[in-house]
Amino acid sequence: MNGPIIMTREERMKIVHEIKERILDKYGDDVKAIGVYGSLGRQTDGPYSDIEMMCVMSTEEAEFSHEWTTGEWKVEVNFDSEEILLDYASQVESDWPLTHGQFFSILPIYDSGGYLEKVYQTAKSVEAQKFHDAICALIVEELFEYAGKWRNIRVQGPTTFLPSLTVQVAMAGAMLIGLHHRICYTTSASVLTEAVKQSDLPSGYDHLCQFVMSGQLSDSEKLLESLENFWNGIQEWTERHGYIVDVSKRIPF
């Protein structure tokens, strides 16, 4: 296995159509639509990019996938019923800015009834409250927990974990910003560079990202100071935008 190897877009699309024909031969009328997503769907694939496809099935509760490599290239094909796919497209979790971009750049390969457009419209029309709730959950479930971790490091170490924790905090901050602006990042590789270009960032976020993007993660004191500044910035930012986190006096149940 010496891959991935360099391939052209034309070579990838030839494989896509081969897979499409295989799907139609095997599943026949059970197939409603087939599309390509990811960099290949956006037409921004690089020489080593993989192939990602989705298949809308008429079978109720269909939900499975195939992921494989030939040793030279890799493919992932997700098979979902229309109901399951629409339900997922309408969900908003903390990682929505990274997971749901697939629904905004689907390249149809086979679509007998406009199903992929329906998926796109569903993802596009998610109600604002879901984003609000996801932001509040992200602050409690991830960022608050991370704050405890870096404060523990300040007191008792180990500082060896601080660089990777800083990267995690920067990524969580990017999800916060993406949810607030309701944008999906192009790729995981471009999350931070795209996040810092957004308007109305929490104070301290841009400075924190500069450490991560430059790889300057060896000075523990500077990292801890930057993390605290960002955490303070989040407090002011959430209050300004009305993201009220429920705080229980003791035990809420």
Curated annotation (Swiss-Prot):
Keyword annotations: Antibiotic resistance, ATP-binding, Nucleotide-binding, Plasmid, Transferase
EC number: 2.7.7.-
Pfam families per the UniProt record, alphabetical: KNTase_C
Classification via InterPro entries: KNTase_C, NT_sf
Temperature dependence: Thermostable at 50 degrees Celsius for over 30 minutes, at 55 degrees Celsius for about 9 minutes.
An annotated GO BP: response to antibiotic
Top EC category: transferase
Catalytic activity of the protein: kanamycin A + ATP = 4'-adenylylkanamycin A + diphosphate; amikacin + ATP = 4'-adenylylamikacin + diphosphate; neomycin B + ATP = 4'-adenylylneomycin B + diphosphate; paromomycin + ATP = 4'-adenylylparomomycin + diphosphate
NCBIfam families attached to this UniProt entry: ANT_4p_I, ANT_4p_Ia
Job description of the protein: Inactivates aminoglycoside antibiotics such as kanamycin by catalyzing the transfer of a nucleotidyl group from nucleoside triphosphates such as (d)ATP to the 4'-hydroxyl group of the aminoglycoside.
Complexes and interactors: Homodimer.
Protein name, as recorded: Aminoglycoside nucleotidyltransferase (4')
